[in-house]
Regions:
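Short cytoplasmic-facing helical segments at TM-TM junctions of multi-pass membrane proteins
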Residues: 123-169, 196
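Transmembrane alpha-helical segments of polytopic membrane transport and secretion proteins
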Residues: 6, 224-253
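Glycine-rich helix-loop "coupling/hinge" segments at transmembrane-helix boundaries
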Residues: 103, 132, 177-218, 234-239
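Transmembrane-helix boundary motif in ABC transporter permease subunits
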Residues: 17-20, 34-45, 57-86
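Generic hydrophobic transmembrane alpha-helix motif, especially the helices
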Residues: 53-56, 60-64, 73, 83-120
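Single conserved hydrophobic/aromatic residue that forms the stacking wall/gate
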Residues: 2-7, 11
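Membrane-spanning helices that line or support transport/gating and their immediate boundary helices
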Residues: 46-50, 70, 80-84, 127-134, ...
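Transmembrane alpha-helices
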Residues: 114, 118, 150-183, 206, ...
Length: 253
């Protein structure tokens, strides 16, 4: 099913405009090519379903993961308790997460979101913990000396300094979520995974290739978008941002 042109244009703007704002023209062209490809191969609705499932899963995973990562970074005892849990979560096969989710929530989108959220959580917890622990003690002592309490030091000093590591964890979480969202078709989740599975059952190589390319483009887009968000923003001086039709130092020629 192909959505109406008006709705399609709205979705394209919602995807392309943030790419221009955070990643520049190159990322925007990549995202535009991706969304046009989704529509060209008649997999727009499936791509949007996968995008919605993954977006909600990543949102919940990042919220819970950052909170747990901060606790790990502030407490050695909490980190020792979480480490074997995270190690176990990362060595378990992806299909194992689908079984308890299906047992408690049945078949559909809800168990897919739960399984994806849990499966993609370890990277954001580990990298948030790493970022918090890498903040220099001198910086924390300076903030305390200027009268900051523990919460102010955490939210105004430690978390901002740990933000590059946290954003790297968000990027890894997105990649892991995309991997499991495709597999979640086995518990009734709709999206690109179901399209690929039906194509494989029918031995339709072209259809399966189209679905795989859609997943590949989605992964590349989110990887580049995550890297663009994690980069430090640098601004040019006001005079350097102006556009001049003729060179200003023409007298040297």
């Amino acid at each position: 099913r192909i959505p109406s042109s008006a709705a399609s244009d709205v979705y394209k703007r919602q995807l392309v405009i943030p790419s221009v704002a955070f990643g520049g023209l190159r990322l925007a062209l990549l995202v535009l090519f991706g969304v046009l490809f989704w529509g060209a191969v008649d997999l727009w609705d499936s791509s949007m379903e996968t995008l919605a499932l993954m977006g909600l899963s990543v949102f919940l995973s990042v919220i819970v993961g950052v909170i747990l990562g901060v606790f790990c970074g502030l407490s050695d005892r909490f980190e020792r308790g979480m480490k074997p849990v995270l190690d176990t979560m990362q060595v378990m096969p992806a299909f194992v997460y689908l079984i308890p989710a299906m047992f408690f929530f049945g078949i559909g989108g809800a168990p897919a979101i739960l399984a994806t959220m849990i499966y993609s959580m370890p990277p954001i917890i580990r990298l948030t913990n790493l970022g918090i622990r890498q903040v220099p003690n001198e910086t924390i002592e300076t903030a305390t000396a200027f009268g900051s309490n523990k919460l102010q030091t955490l939210f105004k000093v430690q978390v901002p300094l740990a933000l590059p590591s946290i954003m790297m964890g968000v990027n890894q979480t997105i990649m892991m979520a995309l991997a499991l969202v495709v597999l979640a078709t086995f518990i009734g989740a709709q999206g690109l995974g179901s399209e690929i599975w039906v194509a494989i059952r029918k031995l339709d190589v072209g259809w399966a290739m189209e679905g795989g390319l859609c997943v590949l483009l989605m992964a590349i887009m989110f990887d580049r978008f995550g890297k663009a968000l994690s980069k430090e923003k640098t601004t040019l001086p006001a005079d350097s941002q102006r556009f001049y039709l003729l060179p200003q130092n023409w007298e040297i020629y």
